[in-house]
């Protein structure tokens, strides 16, 4: 029990640090919409580009656009449901709420997207820039999928392992993709990652919570 309480305190400390980091980053972006840090980071990322890399980066981001994203979520939930994993199917559907979270903050901060000649625009996007909805969604959806592959031992290992590897690939490649494509600044994707981790923690706690014993 003491070990369990210690683990909980550590996790709360980590989530608190993530929340503070996100709030500080939000304040920084609100007062400094275009910073030298963002410009220099974009220049470094976009310095080495070619047609093949353009295609790869577009492909990585593609699954986060409409209608691919909701189709992927609903399709994944249906697969879980078909194999009698009803609770998992429900929680997978909850990941679509990331769009509501990111859109609400975008409207509040109202940060413009990167534009030429400051950066090279490969993919033109709509909505505001902060935070990155793609990064938030990928961290939440693919992160939760990774958690399920770890927790649900009844799923065959030959499925759990590749799904986990692919999910982690998307999680860590999407921030690079969004900056490379000129769709976001460095601070946008960083905020999206932090917020995604916070949302993933909340969703995971709710999923792993054991029902109270009936009296």
Label each region the model flagged.
Residues 11-15, 86-94, 159-166, 191:
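Alpha-helical transmembrane segments of integral membrane proteins
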Residues 21-24, 97-103, 168-178:
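Aromatic-anchored segments of alpha-helical transmembrane domains
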Residues 118-215:
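Membrane-embedded catalytic cores of phosphoryl/pyrophosphoryl-handling enzymes
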Residues 99-113:
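Transmembrane alpha-helix/helix-exit interface in multi-pass inner-membrane proteins
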Residues 1-68, 111-125:
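N-terminal transmembrane-helix/juxtamembrane module of multi-pass inner/ER membrane proteins
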Residues 82, 108-109, 207-210:
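Helix-loop junctions at the membrane-solvent interface of multi-pass transporters
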Residues 73-101:
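Interfacial segments of alpha-helical transmembrane regions
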Residues 63-83, 139-145, 149:
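Hydrophobic alpha-helical transmembrane segments
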């Amino acid at each position: 029990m003491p070990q369990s309480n210690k683990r909980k305190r550590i996790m709360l400390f980590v989530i608190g640090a993530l929340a503070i980091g996100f709030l500080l980053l939000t304040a920084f972006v609100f007062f400094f919409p275009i910073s030298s840090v963002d410009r220099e980071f974009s220049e470094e990322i976009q310095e080495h580009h070619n047609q093949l890399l353009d295609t790869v980066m577009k492909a990585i981001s593609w699954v986060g656009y409409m209608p691919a994203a909701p189709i992927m979520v609903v399709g994944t939930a249906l697969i879980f449901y078909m194999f009698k994993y009803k609770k998992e199917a429900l929680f997978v559907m909850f990941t679509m709420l990331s769009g509501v979270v990111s859109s609400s903050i975008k409207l509040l901060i109202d940060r413009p997207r990167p534009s030429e000649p400051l950066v090279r625009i490969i993919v033109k996007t709509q909505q505001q820039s902060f935070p990155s909805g793609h990064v938030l969604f990928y961290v939440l959806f693919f992160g939760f999928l990774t958690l399920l592959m770890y927790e649900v031992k009844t799923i065959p290992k030959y499925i759990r392992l590749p799904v986990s590897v692919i999910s982690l690939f998307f999680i860590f490649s999407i921030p690079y993709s969004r900056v490379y494509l000129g769709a976001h600044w460095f601070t946008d994707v960083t905020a999206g990652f932090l917020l995604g981790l916070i949302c993933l923690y909340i969703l995971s706690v709710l999923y792993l919570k054991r029902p109270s014993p009936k009296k």
